[in-house]
Design a protein with these regions (language model features):
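Alpha-helical transmembrane segments
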Residues: 1-13, 73-87, 242-251
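Membrane-interface "cap" regions at the ends of multi-pass membrane proteins
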Residues: 1-60, 174-177, 202
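Central hydrophobic cores of alpha-helical transmembrane segments in multi-pass inner-membrane proteins
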Residues: 8-19, 52-61, 81-94, 167-175, ...
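Hydrophobic alpha-helical transmembrane segments
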Residues: 15-34, 72-77, 106-111, 136-139, ...
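Short helix-coil transition sites and intra-membrane helix breaks within transmembrane domains
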Residues: 22-25, 52-56, 99-103, 135-143, ...
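Loop-to-helix junctions at membrane interfaces in multi-pass transport proteins
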Residues: 37-39, 44, 61-62, 67-78, ...
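Helix-loop-helix junctions that connect adjacent transmembrane helices in secondary transporters/permeases
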Residues: 67-176, 265-310
Length: 310
């Protein structure tokens, strides 16, 4: 069943790339390839932005962190939620208008150069270096997460081979279909992520079978020994978190204003007037997803206790 599910998923991703390859044969030019001709609708813009942002860390990193260290780590999710909302409300519409006005810029380095009338390539070079270093780490972590999913479902699969498959599929649909293929694959991935995150807490309640067990008071007082050897109260650590940990968690949201893979979505939406609808979709998505992740960690901890683990 797992093999069939992955096969269908990969065929869908590659199919999107092939579709836009043939559909876009008559649509030439850099703007078409890198921004989809600035023709993306509000739903695709919203879902692709959120899926490309909250990928492996949302499904694995954040719930795993809360499961291991307590709900005090939920402050990271709150910071990211606030950052997402502010990014859509403050940056999105302005960037769409200004990138068009700045000589119809199609990349962020080009936009910054045109916006500030830079006479030398220094700004572009600095941007390129920052992007190269940051995205090498970011993409490596995404590939690592994808590989872990593969190998957890198929233990006999060599991790290196799994990573090659994962990377090859992404490269194929990206080179074939360009920006539109990337956005549409992210759109479907965003839907899949939301359905999964909403479903897991519901199935967890069914597995636990009793509401009284779900609200078991022992969860309030349970102590978790983190990977660093520190003792955490699983639930109340959210309220008793150290101020510096709260500030650190909330500060994660500041990164949104400089994430190229999100900002480029703002630049590609068809009309500035569509940003409002797109922002509503994105904000609802991120709130539902982050709340669901907290529930996943909470129910996961209950199931761990039921199995006699710590």
């Amino acid at each position: 069943m797992e093999i069939l599910a992955f096969a269908i998923y990969f065929v869908l991703m590659l199919g999107i790339g092939v579709w836009f390859f043939f559909k876009g044969k008559d649509e030439t030019g850099e703007q078409e390839y890198f921004l989809g001709g600035r023709s993306m609708g509000p739903w695709v813009t919203a879902m692709s932005a959120q899926a490309s942002d909250m990928s492996a860390w949302l499904l694995m990193g954040l719930p795993g962190s809360m499961l291991a260290f307590g709900l005090g780590k939920a402050w990271i999710g709150i910071g990211l939620g606030i950052g997402t909302i502010l990014n859509w409300l403050i940056t999105a519409k302005r960037l769409r208008k200004l990138s068009k006005a700045a000589n119809d810029s199609i990349t962020l380095p080009q936009y910054l150069t045109n916006r500030f009338a830079a006479k030398n390539p220094a700004l572009k070079i600095v941007c390129a270096i920052v992007f190269l270093i940051s995205f090498t780490i970011y993409v490596a972590s995404a590939f690592s997460a994808g590989t872990k999913v593969f190998t957890s479902l198929f233990p006999a699969l060599d991790p290196t081979f799994a990573m090659i498959i994962f990377a090859a599929i992404i490269l194929i649909y990206t080179f074939l279909g360009g920006y539109k293929a990337v956005c549409w694959t992210d759109f479907f991935q965003g839907l899949l992520m939301l359905v999964a995150l909403l479903s897991i807490p519901l199935f967890s309640v069914v597995i636990i079978t009793r509401v009284s067990a779900v609200l078991d008071s022992s969860m309030i007082t349970q102590t978790v020994i983190g990977a660093d050897g520190t003792a955490y109260n699983f639930v109340t650590s959210f309220f008793s978190a150290d101020p510096k940990d709260i500030i650190s968690g909330l500060a994660w949201g500041l990164g949104y204003f400089g994430m190229p893979h999100i900002l480029v979505r703002f630049m590609s939406i068809e009309k500035p007037s569509m940003v409002k609808k797109s922002s509503i979709v994105a904000i609802i998505w991120v709130i539902l997803s982050l709340v669901s992740v907290v529930l996943v960690a909470y129910f996961g901890r209950i199931l761990v206790l039921r199995n006699g683990q710590s």
